[in-house]
């Protein structure tokens, strides 16, 4: 039996995780749930899973939740505020944490879980993008275990040699016969949209992904392929890969979730229909496998599967991320922060879709490339990048 805290339980990954847990009650028990402010859904989750603890970042939402649970006659410990997630990520009574709070907001609670030596299922890619080697050092220093949940990194993890799985970020890929990691991406909803029409894309259009059901921020990142760029950076950290050891390919059907090329000419791949419950289940149950109710892959019905190179003119954010990864940690931290601000501004209709890349480029052009030596320095870089991003947005709005 594994005992869990779910960070971000009311989000897309959190709700999918709870679906998997509900199908395997003999293997997983929820001890704590954490969310920002969705007390309505949290009430239902408490009713279904009866955790011992709940954390709500928003204090008003915590009060509403407490009132709802009192009416239902359910007694649960409720804490609130910015430290709630950190406290519940380090509970003594749990061994596993699903880190699914989006953005850099999820960094501190994920670090709290690592420092408590927990098994961390990482769905928050921004933690690695922002902190890189410093983040991986926390994993090793505190004897924690890190398992990737992103479908691409989870796929890569599944088809890498076991020693690399056991010591993520430490071992040489080439020593174990790996010549290249191939990250796949659908290209999002605008893969065939005329380039001159991209500036008029609305936030609602950008949030409709052709294959995946996701939150609004990650849907926009998928449309710009910044999501793939962040995954490129994350893959370098997780798998100790050089820029020459990672390739990005467009794969519109999202059946091949990633591939690993070996020195003997073999290419191993993980295939499945697009469904986040599959990588979530693998991460939850690793190193074993447990059953879940998903549609099995039917090769006779797949039809044509295609691959292509990404177009840098269509996806400038992807190229920005690749270039930032070559510059170092200060650049990737800056890019991640700038992108979060830019995407939020786009969703609020303050800038155009094509301005997201412009904001990211403008902020990167201003950075001080001195590398951070601590998490605190990372957070300082993050704050400065956000300030510069807001200034860039004001400039574009003139």
Curated annotation (Swiss-Prot):
Pathway of this protein? Isoprenoid biosynthesis; isopentenyl diphosphate biosynthesis via DXP pathway; isopentenyl diphosphate from 1-deoxy-D-xylulose 5-phosphate: step 1/6
This protein's cofactor list reads:
Mg(2+); Mn(2+)
User: Mind listing the UniProt keywords for this protein, alphabetically?
Assistant: Isoprene biosynthesis, Manganese, Metal-binding, NADP, Oxidoreductase
Q: Where do the coiled-coil regions begin and end?
A: none
Q: Which residues bind NADPH?
A: 10-13, 38, 124, 126, 215
Its catalytic activity?
A: 2-C-methyl-D-erythritol 4-phosphate + NADP(+) = 1-deoxy-D-xylulose 5-phosphate + NADPH + H(+)
Enzyme Commission number(s): 1.1.1.267
Q: Which residues cross the membrane?
A: none
Q: Does the keyword Amino-acid biosynthesis apply?
A: no
- One of its Pfam families is DXP_reductoisom
Residues that, per the record, bind 1-deoxy-D-xylulose 5-phosphate: 125, 151-152, 186, 209, 222, 227-228, 231
Q: Which InterPro entries match?
A: DXP_reductoisomerase, DXP_reductoisomerase_C, DXP_reductoisomerase_N, DXPR_C, DXPR_C_sf, NAD(P)-bd_dom_sf
Any one of the GO BP annotations: isopentenyl diphosphate biosynthetic process, methylerythritol 4-phosphate pathway involved in terpenoid biosynthetic process
Annotated GO molecular function terms are: 1-deoxy-D-xylulose-5-phosphate reductoisomerase activity; manganese ion binding; NADPH binding
Please tell me where Mn(2+) binds in this chain.
150, 152, 231
**SUPFAM superfamilies reported in the protein's UniProt record:** 1-deoxy-D-xylulose-5-phosphate reductoisomerase, C-terminal domain, Glyceraldehyde-3-phosphate dehydrogenase-like, C-terminal domain, NAD(P)-binding Rossmann-fold domains
Instruction: Report the sequence similarity comment from the record.
Output: Belongs to the DXR family.
Describe its function: Catalyzes the NADPH-dependent rearrangement and reduction of 1-deoxy-D-xylulose-5-phosphate (DXP) to 2-C-methyl-D-erythritol 4-phosphate (MEP).
User: What's this protein's name?
Assistant: 1-deoxy-D-xylulose 5-phosphate reductoisomerase
Please give the organism.
Baumannia cicadellinicola subsp. Homalodisca coagulata
